[in-house]
């Protein structure tokens, strides 16, 4: 370290800031923390994992097998996509699980950093700590304030670590999820709360309004196989968004989605055809044995890999807290996303563009988003307001702000909550303009009866252990939707109970009443007063103080709302409220880099330097500009990195063209007016925060008849929104369709009649009256048709269909390493004594297992779904 830090002035400044005494002569010895050596993971193999789970009474499952992956000709699987094969977009062969032998899968997660294995991974930002030290010792203003920020930053480095935790931390998280689902407030289905699918959908209209898929551009109906959503002749791709670099999951462990696109499509197509056959044979909710047998064959569609989430963890909780990602099987992700993504991607409806909406879906705190929230509170300081985003609920009442989180939100879900999501998407999203459904019976069965059990109360793979998942698997395609539904139900019951104050016992009693656990994360009393104080004390200098590209003279006061992790501060220069990342989160992000997020750039010359530039500029954007010491340090390091890149002759623009993909804040920067120059100035921050043009809402015109959740809950309580419980069959009847068509014809006929040229007021009123009556007739019939659809789907809202798997209590059997080996299907299909037997006897040549014979038949079927 430079001698500048060992001068008497520097040593005195640093020791005072850190509150240190009796330090050594060399500043570096005590200023720069040594790389952390994490404790040894107590769980080293599957036997120890099984014993840990058994001690905590966690349900382990008997191992199930998957047919070996076999290469098949892509052109034969998808004749209509031969053009993709010819162009090289698709490979000539496709792997599908259709071999004559089966194996029991295994997945061993990677945890970094590890005990006694030094690695650069997860190291703190040494350059930023050194730069902050230099800036602190050479600063002239506010040494006490900057000393506090410096100490907080170094404490963050000492107390936290970026990494993927431990096996014991993952298992501890599983056990904690089970305790939430089955413990003091066991999960309750909507039916146990007296809520029908239609009632939940009516509430979701207020908390998460949606429109038709694709918005004004339209979208193909849910009536085909997934491969038919690709049209090479027209260059159209209607598949949901796919992150190609992410894990493919079962049955392709170790591969990415980009490597297995055709494989996943082949599985989805085959599965859809099989479901279609079951539907044709009459497999409904009352008789679902055929579907159940089908799901037994495709059991792996409901088994996610238990992936450790790389995050900034507290070192003291390294062995007890590792967040899990339920890495869904790629085919499952495709099926669920095909139902939800086209709708949600075009339904960014929230508090900013839909009156009286309480949703924060698609909300961005920039572009005037934070200002809209704060000014709304200040405009009606004595009103009660609330907002919802997934498992986050915000309540403002009695001049106090409450930030509430569902406790381990995913653990509170039941399959019926996922079913409510399906019902809502089908009845409010997948409908035609005339009210008829834009889906067929096969997709309705997938959505209502199968999809819920694929991701809720399903299973996961950890090492070679197959385990029950309590609640929904975190990270599945519907995680947000299911969590948002849970929060909507909780807020609805809070309104029904008379809106008790969150501090009250009546409010906390909602946990037991709903089976939804929650905790109050933050509470700000006298919020209007706190906001006024922040305005009065707002800084007069710096980026958004006076409009100069300089750090402020002192830290701008913030009001820590914890609104999706953001605080609010007031800009005198812009005369508006702007977002800054919660200081604790900002320091954590600054202390521990996550590394280059854009995997496509890895290995390119200058990419790592470009990442440092993007990271520092992004930290400035999200709030670093508000803290003088942090801002000066980030700006200095960015300038040095730019010079470094310039000296190497590497143009920055070529590396940062898609710079937002290089940062952990990419979701926030999406659709913001940011140029590719990527240099944070006062003008840059002003463009970032100026109120932009709001997206036009995309809301189903047949719905959202009741404005506001409070009125909606009141109407539900009085029975005004209840649907008849009679079942009208899954498809609209021909009679229903004829009524719609007849009404539409009447409307069109009258609308096309020549209009009167008379100046007589009564003649013109006759024209208007005829049009009004025809329009009312059409809308009435369209809504009646929708009611038919609702009633039909209620017929599918009984118990969901799921594969039944026996429990395995023997830790030796469930963890025996032999299950990780590839075995003949006749001995590997979940039979424990065969798994533990000696030797391997392969089946005779050409002999296929029952499951393999089924798979062969499925491949040979070329018929599509038209039921």
Swiss-Prot record:
Residues 851-867 have a biased composition (Basic residues). It catalyses: RNA(n) + a ribonucleoside 5'-triphosphate = RNA(n+1) + diphosphate. The keyword Nucleotidyltransferase applies. One of its GO terms (molecular function) is GTP binding. Its EC number is 2.7.7.48. May exist in multiple phosphorylated forms. It comes from Blotched snakehead virus. Interacts with VP3 in the cytoplasm. One of its GO terms (biological process) is viral genome replication. Keywords: Covalent protein-RNA linkage, GTP-binding, Nucleotide-binding, Nucleotidyltransferase, Phosphoprotein, RNA-directed RNA polymerase, Transferase, Viral RNA replication, Virion. It is an enzyme of class 2 (transferase). Pfam families: Birna_RdRp_C, Birna_RdRp_palm, Birna_VP1_thumb. This is RNA-directed RNA polymerase. One of its GO terms (cellular component) is virion component. It is found in: Virion.
């Amino acid at each position: 370290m430079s001698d500048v830090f060992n001068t008497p002035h520097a040593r005195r400044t640093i020791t005072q800031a850190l509150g240190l005494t009796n330090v050594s002569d060399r500043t570096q010895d005590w200023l720069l923390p040594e790389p952390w050596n994490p404790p040894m993971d107590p769980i080293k193999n599957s036997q120890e994992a099984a014993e840990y789970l058994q001690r905590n009474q966690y349900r382990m499952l008997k191992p199930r097998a998957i047919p070996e992956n076999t290469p098949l000709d892509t052109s034969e699987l998808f004749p209509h996509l031969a053009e993709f094969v010819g162009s090289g977009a698709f490979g000539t062969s496709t792997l599908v699980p259709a071999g004559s032998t089966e194996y029991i899968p295994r997945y061993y997660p990677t945890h970094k950093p590890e005990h006694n294995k030094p690695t650069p991974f997860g190291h703190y930002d040494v350059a930023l700590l050194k730069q902050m030290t230099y800036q602190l010792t050479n600063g002239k203003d506010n040494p006490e304030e900057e000393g506090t920020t410096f100490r907080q930053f170094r404490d963050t480095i000492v107390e936290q670590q970026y990494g993927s935790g431990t096996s014991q931390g993952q298992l501890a998280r599983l056990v904690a999820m089970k305790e939430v689902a089955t413990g003091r407030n066991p999960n309750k289905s909507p039916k146990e709360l007296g809520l029908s699918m239609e009632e939940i959908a009516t509430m979701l209209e207020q908390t998460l309004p949606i429109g038709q898929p694709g918005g004004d551009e339209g979208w193909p109906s849910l009536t085909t196989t997934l491969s038919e959503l690709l049209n090479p002749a027209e260059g159209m791709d209607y598949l949901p968004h796919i992150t190609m670099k992410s894990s493919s999951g079962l049955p392709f462990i170790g591969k990415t989605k980009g490597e297995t696109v055709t494989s996943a499509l082949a599985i989805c197509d085959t599965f859809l055809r099989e479901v279609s056959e079951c539907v044709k044979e009459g497999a409904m909710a009352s008789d679902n044995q055929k579907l159940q047998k089908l799901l037994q064959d495709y059991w792996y569609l409901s088994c996610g890999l238990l992936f450790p989430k790389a995050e900034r963890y507290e070192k003291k909780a390294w062995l007890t807290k590792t967040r899990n990602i339920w890495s869904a099987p790629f085919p499952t992700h495709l099926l669920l996303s095909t139902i939800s993504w086209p709708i949600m991607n075009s339904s960014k409806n929230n508090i900013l563009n839909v009156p009286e909406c309480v949703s924060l879906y698609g909300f961005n705190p920039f572009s005037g988003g934070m200002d809209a929230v704060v000014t709304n509170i200040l405009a009606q300081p004595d009103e009660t307001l609330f907002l919802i985003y997934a498992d986050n609920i915000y309540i403002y009442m009695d001049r106090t702000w409450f930030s509430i989180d569902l406790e381990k939100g995913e653990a509170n879900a039941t399959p019926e909550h996922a079913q409510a999501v399906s019902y809502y998407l089908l009845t409010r999203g997948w409908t035609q303009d005339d009210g008829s459904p834009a889906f067929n019976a096969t997709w309705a069965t997938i959505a209502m009866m199968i999809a819920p059990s694929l991701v809720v109360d399903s299973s996961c793979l950890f090492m070679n252990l197959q385990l029950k998942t309590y609640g929904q698997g975190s990270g599945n395609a519907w995680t947000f939707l299911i969590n948002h539904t849970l929060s909507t139900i909780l807020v609805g019951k809070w309104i029904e109970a008379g809106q008790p104050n969150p501090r009250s016992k009546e409010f906390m009693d909602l946990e037991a009443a709903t089976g939804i656990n929650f905790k109050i994360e933050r509470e700000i009393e006298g919020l209007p007063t706190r906001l006024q104080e922040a305005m009065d004390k707002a800084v007069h200098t710096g980026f958004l103080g006076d409009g100069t590209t300089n750090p402020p003279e002192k830290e701008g006061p913030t009001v820590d709302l914890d609104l999706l992790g953001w605080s609010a501060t007031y800009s005198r220069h812009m005369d508006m409220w702007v977002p800054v990342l919660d200081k604790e989160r900002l320091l954590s992000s600054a202390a521990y880099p996550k590394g280059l997020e854009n995997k496509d750039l890895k290995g390119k010359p200058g990419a790592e330097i470009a990442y440092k530039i993007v990271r520092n500029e992004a930290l400035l954007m999200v709030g670093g500009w508000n803290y003088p010491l942090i801002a000066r340090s980030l700006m200095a390091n960015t300038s040095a990195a730019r010079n470094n890149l310039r000296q190497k002759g590497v143009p920055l623009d070529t590396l940062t063209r898609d710079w937002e993909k290089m940062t952990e804040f990419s979701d926030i920067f999406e659709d913001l007016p940011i140029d590719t120059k990527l240099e944070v100035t006062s003008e840059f921050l002003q463009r970032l925060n100026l109120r932009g043009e709001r997206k036009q809402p995309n809301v189903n015109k047949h719905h959202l008849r009741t404005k506001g959740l409070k009125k909606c809950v009141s109407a539900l309580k009085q029975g005004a929104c209840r649907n008849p419980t009679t079942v009208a069959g899954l498809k609209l009847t021909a009679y229903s369709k004829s009524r719609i068509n007849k009404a539409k014809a009447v409307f069109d006929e009258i609308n096309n009649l020549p209009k009167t040229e008379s100046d007589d007021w009564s003649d013109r009123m006759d024209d208007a009256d005829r049009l009004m009556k025809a329009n009312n007739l059409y809308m009435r019939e369209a809504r009646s048709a929708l009611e038919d659809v609702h009633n039909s789907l209620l017929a599918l809202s009984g118990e969901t269909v799921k594969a039944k798997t026996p429990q395995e209590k023997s830790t030796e059997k469930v963890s025996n390493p032999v299950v990780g080996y590839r075995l003949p299907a006749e001995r590997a299909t979940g039979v424990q004594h065969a798994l533990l037997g000696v030797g391997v006897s392969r089946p005779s040549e050409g002999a296929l297992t029952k499951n393999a014979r089924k798979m062969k038949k499925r491949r040979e079927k070329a018929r599509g779904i038209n039921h």
